[in-house]
Design a protein with these regions (language model features):
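Alpha-helical transmembrane segments and their helix-start/interface "positive-inside/aromatic belt" motifs
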Residues: 1-10, 80-100, 203-213, 268
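Non-cytosolic segments of integral membrane proteins
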Residues: 94-186, 224-277
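Short amphipathic alpha-helical coupling elements at transmembrane boundaries
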Residues: 23-26, 82-89, 116, 120, ...
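Hydrophobic alpha-helical transmembrane segments
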Residues: 53-65, 161-162, 180
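Alpha-helical transmembrane segments
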Residues: 191-208, 240, 271-275
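Alpha-helical membrane-interface segments at transmembrane helix boundaries
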Residues: 44-52, 84-88, 92, 141, ...
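Binding/recognition "hotspot" determinant
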Residues: 1-58
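Hydrophobic transmembrane alpha-helix segments characteristic of membrane transport
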Residues: 58-94, 186-200
Length: 278
C-alpha cells in the first residue's frame, strides 16, 4: 500500500466497497436457515408454528364465510358437486397451512438454483474487486504539497460518496433478507384465506409478493455481474491531464457506475413487479 494519505484514503474507500460487494454475494447465495448460525431461523420457525394454530382457526372462519357467500341456501351445500368442491377447497387450504413452510422453502430453493445458474453461466463465482489504477497512484505520489491540496477535497468527497453508497447497497440486501423472514413467520395467517372463495385473493397476493421478494435476489446478482464487468475494464485515464483532473474524472465515472448498481439493487422489487406483472 502506498504511503501517500490521498492514495490510502481512496484505496480504503474501494476496500470497503469491495467488502460490501463480497458480503452481498455471500448473503444472496446463503439460505435463511444458515444465516447467522441459524439462530434467527429457529425463532422464525417457532413463530410460524405458533401462528399455525391461529391460521387453522381463521381457516374455519374463512371457510364458513365462503360457504355463506357462495351458496344461496343449505340445499345447495347438500348437492354432491358443491359438497365435493367445498371439501377439496378446505383440504387444500389446510394442506397449504400445514406444509406452507416447506412449500415456501422449496420455492426459495428453486430461486437459489436460478441464482447459482446465473453466476456460473456468467463465470462469476465471486464479486470482482475494484482497484485504483496505477496511473492515478503514480500521478498522486508525484504531486507537490500545493498541487495535492485540491486532491484532498476530491478524495474526501469521493471517498465519502463510496462509503455512503456501500452502506445503502448492503442495507437494501439485508432488507430483502429480513423480508423473507417476515413472510415466513406470518405465512399461516394470509394462507388461511384460501379456505374461502371471497378471501382467496389475499392468499394469492401473499404468494405473489413472496415470489417477488425471492426473485429480487436474481435481479441483485444480475446487477452485480453487470457492475463487475464494468469494474473489470477500468476507465481510460488521461495521463497528460493534471493529477486533480485525473482523480476527479476517475472518481466521477466510478461513482456513476456505483450509482447504477445501487439504484438497481434498491429498485430490484420494482423491476421484478414490472417484469413478472406481480
Amino acid at each position: 500500500m502506498s504511503d501517500n494519505w490521498i492514495v490510502q484514503n481512496l484505496e480504503r474507500a474501494l476496500e470497503i466497497w469491495n467488502e460490501k460487494l463480497a458480503e452481498i454475494w455471500m448473503i444472496i447465495t446463503q439460505s435463511p436457515e444458515n444465516f447467522k448460525g441459524g439462530s434467527i431461523w429457529s425463532v422464525i420457525t417457532s413463530i410460524h408454528g405458533a401462528l399455525q394454530a391461529i391460521g387453522y382457526a381463521l381457516l374455519v372462519l374463512f371457510f364458513v364465510i365462503g360457504v355463506m357467500r357462495t351458496c344461496g341456501s343449505f340445499a345447495e351445500v347438500k348437492k354432491p358437486e358443491h359438497a365435493v368442491k367445498l371439501f377439496i377447497r378446505f383440504a387444500i387450504a389446510k394442506g397449504v397451512i400445514t406444509y406452507g413452510l416447506e412449500l415456501m422453502m422449496a420455492f426459495l430453493s428453486i430461486i437459489q438454483g436460478i441464482i447459482s445458474t446465473i453466476m456460473n453461466s456468467a463465470g462469476f463465482g465471486t464479486a470482482t474487486t475494484t482497484v485504483l489504477p496505477t496511473e492515478i497512484v503514480t500521478a498522486i505520489e508525484n504531486c507537490g504539497f500545493f498541487e495535492s491540496i485540491p486532491l484532498w477535497a476530491v478524495t474526501l468527497i469521493g471517498g465519502l460518496f463510496v462509503w455512503v453508497l456501500s452502506f445503502v447497497m448492503i442495507l437494501s440486501v439485508y432488507g430483502r433478507f429480513f423480508k423473507l423472514y417476515m413472510y415466513t413467520a406470518i405465512a399461516p395467517i394470509p394462507l388461511s384465506t384460501f379456505a374461502g372463495e371471497p378471501t382467496q385473493n389475499v392468499g394469492k397476493s401473499f404468494l405473489k409478493s413472496y415470489a417477488g421478494v425471492c426473485l429480487e435476489g436474481a435481479i441483485i446478482v444480475l446487477a452485480c455481474i453487470i457492475f463487475s464487468v464494468f469494474a473489470s475494464s477500468p476507465p481510460v485515464v488521461d495521463t497528460t491531464a493534471t493529477a486533480a483532473s485525473m482523480v476527479w474524472s476517475y472518481i466521477g465515472e466510478l461513482i456513476f457506475n456505483m450509482l447504477i448498481l445501487v439504484g438497481s439493487v434498491k429498485m430490484a422489487d420494482r423491476i421484478v413487479r414490472e417484469m413478472m406483472g406481480l
